[in-house]
């Protein structure tokens, strides 16, 4: 570990606030990010952990229609739900904000203008999916059709199965997932980000990341091998950040373009807020412009290209901002063998869980089954086993025995260390080595291995304390 404190930026995926959080949201990116941030604070690094609610985009407007209210009211309602949930789980955000702030709007528009001034934006007319039944243009996630490159049924402009990009118009047998109607296409103008301009630089940069998880690196290089295409960064919607271009008053900036800029806007907001105890308003630059700083982005696997392709292109094209040091993308947490689904109501909602069980038990269990390299499964049986056989039987009993020894032999006062024999010294050395090993696992973002190392250490030292209690 370094002796000089490092500037560590911990960026946590911004959730759509169109519903309540379930356990899959927590295990996928929020919990590992919090563990990582706490670890780096403990070893003396300067940590800034930021995230916020993604209040824009079609999911929020659809939920507003379902509840017969406005997108703003939905966005604020569920922002509070998510924010309160994170507090209940004791997540240590330096700032959890939202995309509906003036600061975020200004930051997004500033980067948009920088990209435009640097020649990386272009206006084009294109045919975009449209629902005659709902009288609205459809975002990528609300169209479904047959992939033009493989037999899969897919959504949007990218196939999760074959990994290839395409235009929505290339999909066959298209339907709107909002109203199940046939999709038509209408000509409309949009502003595009010239991603091919960044192809060579991104390829070189990603290949240099020898420590990235293989799934992250391989998926990113797969996108590049298919050849990057220009991506529209505006949409025909009326909810979101306004486009700072004449003639685009009835359009908004594409939610995924502006959402990934949220990490920067949140850092700036924190820098100017009372939460910044240093009270240096431009201190955000210590994380974003200092090349020695390290950025860690905690995501689900479905968000990989947005943080290894889209965000780096934006940062390169708009200024001298630091690029991600690592994109820590987890697989999915399933529930009893099936993927969590809000629409199918197949989930364990965090609010329901916390009504019955302690948040620390949840944090421990999710850490032990964290889906780092493959999908993992939440079951109630394994949660109870984890709580009873590990937290209570191993950790809890060890703490109880040590407290009893101190109470019965030293009048509840922790004694000075003296008269250590070889067995004592070996146990202390084993504990030291075990926790150093656990720290190494955390440095490498291997959270399950870290927890296993700690629990093995506790099991190892439990026997001597048990014998001491007996004697």
Task: List the model feature ranges, each with a label.
Residues 182, 421-425:
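Non-catalytic interaction-recognition regions
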Residues 447:
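Aromatic-residue-lined binding/catalytic grooves and analogous aromatic/hydrophobic interfacial grooves
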Residues 2-51, 103-106, 172-408, 450-454:
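Structured secondary-structure scaffolds
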Residues 58-64, 91, 373-382, 435:
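A short small-residue
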Residues 378-382, 387, 405, 409-416, ...:
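Long, amphipathic alpha-helical stalk/connector segments used for oligomerization, subunit docking
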